[in-house]
């Protein structure tokens, strides 16, 4: 929360200085403080994906509404929007290089896509949808992750793994030993899944793993209905359509 508060204070400070706005007194300070925020959150997000645990998942999920709220606040900040417009319409804009001009143009586009021109009640609804979509996206990812970790296959006959590289066999054997099992433990994690699909001569095993991988978090496959993302996807589609309609688009693909 301290990093988010610092970002908010920086936005207010930059806007309060008034025109004329330049790259140095508007864009650069905002980019620097956003970079600090990214350096804090990105490792947490990455660890949540590759080293997931109940404790880390809980901490990660607590940050999502805060980040969504901040993003909406920035995107609907009237003073900041006017500052960027003043920069684009002012003499300083002509002195910017191509990349800087593109950054300013993209920022103004993002304001429009965040509902800056909407009435207050519709802006509020935009924020509610954005927060819920963030939650649903995380729920979707969690279901896929849990479904990935929820499938394993123990192979006791090495002949069934003919064609596999020695490195992949050693990794599968280590996976089994870690769980005090005899043989080769296969999972749907890419380092385990990909060597089987690429090198294994056993067509039946490849098909079994392919079906398990392709039907994760769905109402199909070996874990059908468990960690099912069907309802999550339906709500995401409905909210995305509502969001697009709020912003005046025919559908979300045009957003």
PLM feature spans:
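Zn2+-dependent metallopeptidase catalytic domains
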Residues: 1-255
């Amino acid at each position: 929360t301290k990093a988010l508060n610092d970002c908010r204070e920086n936005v207010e400070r930059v806007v309060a200085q008034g025109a004329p706005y330049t790259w140095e007194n508007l864009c650069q300070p905002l980019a620097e403080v956003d970079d600090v925020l990214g350096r804090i959150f990105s490792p947490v997000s990455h660890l949540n994906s590759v080293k997931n645990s109940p404790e880390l998942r809980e901490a990660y999920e607590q940050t999502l509404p805060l980040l969504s709220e901040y993003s909406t606040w920035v995107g609907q900040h009237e003073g900041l929007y006017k500052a960027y417009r003043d920069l684009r319409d002012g003499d300083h804009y002509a002195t910017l290089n191509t990349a800087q001009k593109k950054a300013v143009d993209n920022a103004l586009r993002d304001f429009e896509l965040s509902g800056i021109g909407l009435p207050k009640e519709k802006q509020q609804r935009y924020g509610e949808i954005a927060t819920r979509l963030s939650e649903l996206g995380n729920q979707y990812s969690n279901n896929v992750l849990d479904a990935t970790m929820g499938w394993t296959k123990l192979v006791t006959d090495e002949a069934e793994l003919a064609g596999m590289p020695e490195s992949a066999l050693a990794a599968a054997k280590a996976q089994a030993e870690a769980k005090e099992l005899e043989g080769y433990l296969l999972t749907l994690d890419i380092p385990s899944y990909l060597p089987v699909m690429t090198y294994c001569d056993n067509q039946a095993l490849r098909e079994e793993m392919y079906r398990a991988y392709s039907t994760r978090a769905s109402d199909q496959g070996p874990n059908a209905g468990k960690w099912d993302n069907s309802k999550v996807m339906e709500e995401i589609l409905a909210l995305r359509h509502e969001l697009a309609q709020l912003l005046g688009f025919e559908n979300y693909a045009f957003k």
